Structures are given as structure tokens and as C-alpha cells.
Regions:
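Terminal targeting signals and extreme-terminal segments of soluble enzymes
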Residues: 1-129
Length: 129
């Protein structure tokens, strides 16, 4: 990945997509086949029990996986199937860190996994797509 592509993906994932801006999601690091995406939990990202809503965890993991693919192939990337396991909870103010990895890239399908941890390294969720 060139430095120019890295800068473009960092800017796009942080400022240009309305969903990421609205949900305070930011792309913080990129390597070939890997993307790190972060979110500090705000009140609107919580469920009725005061912990991260499953939807925000899924979105964060999916964005990390999709961005990881974009580091290798600069084409539209859509999720066709995904499975997530929710392992632990995090509350208001916690920083969630999703690291997406490309496991295999074919001509038309890519297979990825993403782990979400909090700022202490506690594993909160895993996604396979």
C-alpha cells in the first residue's frame, strides 16, 4: 500500500463517510491487509443496560474488515455474510478497538476476521466475514 493510498483511506474512514462521522468511528492505522478502527462509546451507542449496543459492535467490526480489504484492493467491497460472537460488555467512555484482517482474497470474495477489544485489551467480540 502506498503512503498516498494510506492517507486517502485514513481520511475517508474518518471524515468522509456520514455513518462513521455520525457514530464517532475513526480509522487509526492501516497496514497491508489490516485496519485498526476505534470508537469511544457515547450515550447514543449504548443499549438499555448501559453497555455497547450489539449493532455498534457489528458496524465497527464490519468497517474494520472492509477497510482491511481496501488496503489490498481498491474496489467496492460489500459484506455478503458475517457472523459475530459477543464475548464481553463495555460501557460509556470505553474506547473500542477493532482490528480487521484479510485471511484470504479471491477474485470476487474475501474472507476476513475482526477482533474488538477495549483499551485494556479485553476481548469483547469477534467477527468472521
Amino acid at each position: 500500500m502506498t503512503n498516498q493510498l494510506k492517507e486517502k483511506l485514513l481520511a475517508y474512514g474518518t471524515k468522509a463517510e456520514p455513518f462513521t462521522v455520525h457514530n464517532h468511528i475513526r480509522v487509526t492505522d492501516l497496514q497491508d491487509g489490516e485496519a485498526r478502527v476505534e470508537l469511544t462509546l457515547q450515550p447514543e451507542s449504548l443499549n438499555r443496560w448501559g453497555t455497547a449496543h450489539g449493532g455498534i459492535l457489528f458496524a465497527l467490526a464490519d468497517i474494520a474488515a472492509g477497510t482491511a480489504v481496501l488496503t489490498l484492493r481498491q474496489e467496492v467491497c460489500l459484506t455478503v455474510n458475517a457472523s459475530i460472537d459477543f464475548l464481553d460488555a463495555a460501557g460509556l467512555g470505553s474506547t473500542l478497538i477493532a482490528v480487521g484482517h484479510v485471511d484470504r482474497m479471491g477474485k470476487s470474495l474475501c474472507f476476513c476476521h475482526t477482533d474488538i477489544t477495549d483499551e485494556t485489551g479485553r476481548l469483547l467480540a469477534t467477527l468472521r466475514t
